[in-house]
From Swiss-Prot:
Residues that span the membrane, as ranges: none
Record organism: Simian foamy virus type 1 (SFVmac)
Stretches the record annotates as Disordered: 1127-1149
Cofactor, how bound (note): Binds 2 magnesium ions for reverse transcriptase polymerase activity.
Protein name: Pro-Pol polyprotein
Domain RNase H type-1: 590-748
Keyword Nucleotidyltransferase tagged: yes
Residues engaged in binding Mg(2+) 2: 599, 646, 669, 740
UniProt PTM comment: Specific enzymatic cleavages in vivo by viral protease yield mature proteins. The protease is not cleaved off from Pol. Since cleavage efficiency is not optimal for all sites, long and active p65Pro-RT, p87Pro-RT-RNaseH and even some Pr125Pol are detected in infected cells.
Cofactor(s) for this UniProt protein: Mg(2+)
Length: 1149
């Protein structure tokens, strides 16, 4: 507008009311008639200076029109009936030409777009006119910024303000580029020079054209800013929903974030420092947590009425099939963006073309592909020199991961380099360079992918190799894939069966498919013939955890998913066969120094109280080159399963192989044992011999022994040979059959202790002879083959002795009742001598009651540490902390004299050995203790601390792990110190350093309820100069003080341990005890099965063989004495060891 026209009244409108507006060059804020602001709420107050003075006035945010154009601005109320306009609120009335640093070649960009467009000639001319018509929309200068006329955004920071950050070192090459950006933004009001309590570091990033982009590291600010709920849609979702018409256009909103104003109250958060001056943003900064969401939401809202438009941050995509319609919609978009205050960069835009770049991909009619720009970046990659460069390369490659079927396998060697990096240094070889170039070549040759069609069903094709899974997604009826996914199996998954690997791959594919399906059905094609039959897979054939199988099987019940067998899936190349004993099968037995054939067998035990009778057979054979038997063993194992016998036989052979020089072959007919030894044993050894459920393996001691043997002698080969074959079938048939025969013989060796039948006693009763225990006054008769006794209490049955234990067990097992209830139930029908005694004996052997019932005996009394007779004999030491930082200190070393309880406190910065020695050196200048007692912390168990104590002649003593009671004196002092510090430091916990002397004085002059004296009195014999000091000792001479002090100390000496209870028990070797179950679940046994005490360490500590077969040192507090002590059994392993000793002695003779 001509400047003279600004002197004339302008047409304005507020809330539908027309009035006049005047342009005031001196106004700093727009003023409107106060009648229009009665229903508005002020947003802030402002100090207004006029010729009449200064005055605080409310500021409002109002929307109105000037010359038919919408204006949104901050306003004040005025008594006039017209509007006074602030020139900055209507800059379009009188625009000054924008002058920035670098002018962009706008005309060249427009010519390029006109040449590249696919529009017909007539529409090209219309496009040229649009360029001229909307000249104000295009970016004319680098760093040019729009001005979005909306209510300013307020940046909320939550309850905690961010901390100012130091500036990073800046590359000198970046400074000229950054200075130009700052100067241009200052001219446009995007930046202002303003001091702030906050500071954010500037982080220049190089651009491909050699210039530098100004980026600010707002991570510290973003930590304190609440994330708004509205977030941008994922780019994959946008790409799958865009319209792919004949004509496509992409527009780039340059510096879009900087067009959005923020409130003045938010300026301080955005501050940064450049060249010694601090600047703040008046617009939405890049790098701010919520900037993308706020900006995208505004653009989407502006263009919501335009069809076939998608916006993602500052990129806008529009497509139509008709060229005229496409131009008409483009003009609408240009008009909306211009009125909104945005600026469009034609340099990065593409208008009405058949193929365009959007969100990093080349968008075509059918789908998406890698752009030429991206492919050129790949070709420009050079071998990395450090870890950061390698991570940058992997990040670039990862963008195209879905374009090739085996991406994860190709990049796995490069990720291995990252995992093995030593700091920023990497080990890069020529093979790695070749691998990188191969990946780049494969990606540059990758075909385009099809976009997801939401109108069709989703197809998934799944296959797997021993090390990886392969997934491809298709639209139904299409041959071009939507995407590829390649999944590398983890260490646990690599042990799965081939079917389980397919199910794992299928699971990974279906997780992604749920997003891609868009409500349509999912059809899964795989090499699995029948998914329903998989449910019946036997448990021994499953390697995966049950929870995985539950997850896999839930897909069968999902109505959205259908499973199909596809035998046409391409065969995967280079898939190795199932691992077998290749080494053993390719070598002749004569090439081994010795061959052992092993087998195990078990039969039903003739004793009804036992399940099995197991035995193992081992044949030591040598091929020289004929088959020759060197030695053979047939060993009974007792009540064990055939599986244990198979494992024990291999273990026996492994131990024998250790004595033989040269390679040894061990042959077993157990597929489980051979597979476990060759495949599973290394995994078990690495994870502590746990199964897939993270529980200890069965027969863990045997497997540990086999693992040790294989480690000591790596040339032991264990192979599987099918058993029970016809003679001369293979080289190993004869040896295998011999081992089977020896094992069967061993299983039939049963040790039975027979007792004479008592039926003869019953016959004697019927004949008038009375064995001991049968009263003569009772009448004994035979009725229906049962012996009946008539007693004063009634008629009862006298059962044979062989049936009595079964009768008691049946009565007891109904409800696992106690001895009295069980006795009453049995005696209601039966009688025999010593019935109550037999009931008690039987109940004491009930396994369920043993592991569930509480003990009725107490453990021995707690051993008290021997209390020293003199001060300085023994010190207890420990650390308190970490505490809140105070004067740079975090911990306190507490030293307590054992006899007196006197405390010394030393603040330290860390619980280290050097800090401990430094503090104790100060203390030992007074006196050197004989003993130092501590826990097993690193500060007290180091070699440095041990050397220091040895030099001082101090004996070190440590408490039992996880048993703080053994350091009770210092632990109680720690509690007192923390409690006293808490009370003294309410509201100021970081001031504890200054109060340590006060705390030490208070503790040393506090009376002990047990001794009735203070630690200061016990150490020095007199009170300190504190309030409530004892005045009775003030008139005593020093000799009298010392005599009184010795009398007091003697009276405080206590015995080592209190007297034992009448119901306590003392441990001894051979006693049967039961260990308490740690944290038993509900309705679970509270005690483990009985085991014998192997060694008594002290009256309260013993060594037992735990339920896993390991020797463990335990406290008697966690044991109960087994009620029945006469049922000890021999150790099977001991029997086996004894047989080996007999054999060795035989061979030596």
């Amino acid at each position: 507008m001509d400047p003279l026209q600004l002197l004339q009244p302008l047409e304005a409108e507020i809330k539908g009311t027309k009035l006049k507006a005047h342009w005031d060059s001196g106004a700093t804020i727009t003023c409107v008639p106060e009648a229009f602001l009665e229903d508005e709420r002020p947003i802030q107050t402002m100090l207004i200076k006029t010729i009449h003075g200064e005055k605080q006035q409310d500021v409002y945010y109002l929307t109105f029109k000037v010359q038919g154009r919408k204006v949104e601005a901050e306003v004040l109320a005025s008594p006039y009936d017209y509007i006074l306009l602030n020139p900055s609120d209507v800059p379009w009335l009188m625009k000054k030409p924008l002058q920035l640093t670098v002018l962009v070649p706008l005309h060249e960009y427009q010519e390029r777009l006109l040449q590249q467009t696919a529009l017909p000639k007539e529409q090209k001319e219309l496009l040229q006119k649009l360029f001229l018509k909307y000249d104000a929309l295009w970016q004319h200068w680098e760093n040019q910024v729009g001005h979005r006329r909306i209510k300013p955004h307020n940046i909320a920071t939550g309850t905690l303000a961010p901390r100012p950050q130091k500036q990073y070192p800046i590359n000198p090459k970046a400074k000229p580029s950054i200075q130009i950006v700052i100067d241009d933004l200052l001219k446009q009001g995007v930046l202002i020079q303003q001091n702030s309590t906050m500071n954010t570091p500037v982080y220049p990033v190089p651009k491909p054209d050699g210039k530098w982009r100004m980026v600010l590291d707002y991570r510290e600010v973003n930590k304190t800013i609440p994330l708004i709920a509205a977030q941008n849609q994922h780019s994959a979702g946008i790409l799958s929903s865009i319209y792919r018409g004949k004509y496509k256009t992409t527009l780039d909103l340059t510096n879009g974030f900087w067009a959005h104003p923020i409130t003045p109250e938010s300026y301080w958060l955005t501050a940064f420092t450049w060249q010694g001056k601090q600047y703040c943003w008046t617009r939405l900064p890049q790098g701010f947590l919520n900037s993308p969401a706020l900006f995208t939401a505004d653009v989407v809202d502006l263009l919501k009425e335009i069809p076939n438009v998608q916006a993602y941050v500052d990129d806008i995509y529009i497509s139509h099939d008709d060229p005229q319609e496409h131009l008409e919609q483009l003009e609408k978009i240009f008009s909306i963006l211009l009125n909104a205050g945005y600026v469009v960069s034609l340099k990065k835009s593409e208008i009405a073309q058949r193929e365009v770049e959007f969100l990093g991909f080349n968008i075509t009619k059918e789908g998406r592909g890698l752009t030429d720009t991206f492919k050129q970046k790949l070709l420009n990659i050079t071998p990395p020199k450090d870890l950061k460069q390698l991570q940058s390369i992997l990040g670039l490659l990862n963008f195209a991961r879905n374009f090739i079927p085996n991406y994860s396998e190709l990049v796995k060697p490069l990720y291995t380099i990252v995992a093995n990096a030593n700091g920023k240094f990497i080990s890069w070889t020529e093979d790695n360079s070749n691998q990188l170039q191969h990946i780049i070549s494969v990606l540059n040759q990758a075909d385009n992918l099809e976009e997801r069609n939401p109108e069709t069903r989703l197809i998934i094709k799944v296959n797997s190799s021993p090390s990886a899974g392969y997934i491809r997604y298709y639209n139904e009826g299409s041959k071009r894939p939507i995407m590829y996914v390649n999944y590398i199996f983890s260490k646990a998954e690599a042990k799965f069966t081939q079917t389980e690997k397919l199910l794992t791959t299928m699971h990974k594919g279906l997780i992604k498919a749920m997003d891609l399906a868009m409500g349509q059905e999912i059809l899964v094609y795989s090499p699995i013939v029948s998914m329903t039959k998989i449910q019946r897979t036997p448990l021994p054939e499953r390697k995966a955890l049950p929870v995985r199988w539950i997850t896999w099987m839930t897909y069968l019940e999902d109505p959205r998913i259908q499973f199909h067998y596809d035998k046409s899936l391409p065969e995967l190349q280079q898939i190795p066969n199932v691992t077998e004993d290749v080494i053993a099968k390719t070598k002749h037995p004569s090439e081994f120094a010795m061959v052992f054939y092993t087998d195990g067998s078990a039969i039903k035990h003739p004793d009804v109280n036992k399940s099995h009778s197991a035995g193992m057979g081992i044949a030591q054979v040598q091929f020289i080159p004929e088959y020759k038997i060197v030695h053979q063993w047939s060993i009974p194992l007792g009540d064990h399963t055939a599986q244990l016998a198979e494992i024990a036989a291999v273990e026996f052979a492994c131990k024998k192989a250790l004595k033989i020089s040269g390679p040894v072959l061990i042959v077993t007919d157990s597929f489980y044992v051979a597979e476990s030894a060759n495949k599973e044993l290394p995994y078990w050894k690495s994870n502590g011999f746990l199964n897939n459920k993270k529980k200890p393996l069965r027969h863990v001691s045997k497997w540990k022994s086999i693992a040790e043997c294989l480690q000591l002698k790596p040339d032991i080969i264990i192979m599987h040979e099918k058993g029970h074959q016809q003679p001369m079938t293979t080289l190993h048939t004869e040896g295998n059959n011999l081992a089977d025969k020896l094992a069967t013989q061993g299983s039939y060796v049963v040790h039975c202790n027979t007792t004479p039948s008592l039926d003869a006693e019953l016959d004697q009763l019927l004949q008038g002879h009375y064995p001991p225990g049968y009263p003569k006054q009772y009448k004994y008769t035979l009725e229906e083959n049962k012996l009946i006794v008539e007693r004063p209490n009634g008629i009862r049955i006298v059962p044979p002795k062989a049936d009595r234990e079964k009768i008691i067990s049946t009565a007891h097992n109904i409800a696992h009742t106690g001895r009295d209830a069980t006795f009453l139930k049995v005696s209601s029908k039966y009688w025999w001598p010593n019935l109550r005694k037999d009931v008690v004996k039987s109940i004491r052997q009930c396994k369920q009651c043993l592991v569930t019932n509480a003990t009725n005996l107490t453990s021995p009394p707690i051993l008290r540490p021997v209390k020293p007779l003199k001060p300085f004999d023994k010190f207890y030491i420990d650390y308190i902390g970490p505490l809140p930082p105070s004067n740079g200190y975090l911990h306190v070393l507490v030293v307590v004299d054992s006899m007196t309880g006197f405390v010394w406190l030393y603040p330290t910065k860390a619980p280290s050995t050097s800090a401990t020695v430094k503090a104790l050196n100060m203390l030992t200048s007074i006196a050197i203790p004989k003993v130092l007692h501590s826990d097993q912390g690193a500060a007290f168990t180091s070699s440095t601390f041990a050397d220091w104590a040895k030099e001082k002649g101090i004996q070190l003593e440590f408490s039992t792990p996880y048993h703080p009671q053994s350091s009770g004196k210092v632990e109680r002092k720690n509690s007192d110190i923390k409690r006293l510090l808490t009370k003294l430091l309410i509201g100021r916990p970081a001031k504890w350093y200054d109060l340590l002397p006060v705390v030490q004085l208070a503790l040393n002059n506090s009376y002990s309820p047990s001794s009735k004296y203070t630690p200061h009195q016990l150490l020095f014999g007199v009170d300190s100069n504190t309030p409530f000091a004892n005045s009775d000792t003030l008139d005593l001479s020093r000799e009298e003080e010392l005599s009184l002090l010795q009398e007091i100390r003697s009276s405080l000496h206590q015995p080592t341990s209190p007297p034992a209870s009448s119901r306590s028990w003392s441990p001894s070797v051979g006693q049967l005890v039961q260990e308490r179950v740690a944290r038993p679940a509900s309705l679970r046994p509270r005690w483990h099965k009985p085991t014998a005490i192997l060694e008594v360490v002290n009256p309260r500590t013993v060594i037992i063989l735990d339920h896993l077969g390991n020797r463990r040192t335990v406290s008697v507090d966690n044991l109960k004495l087994t009620a029945y002590q006469d049922n000890g059994t021999s150790n099977d392993s001991g029997t086996m060891a004894l047989m080996e000793e007999d054999e060795s002695s035989t061979s030596s003779t």
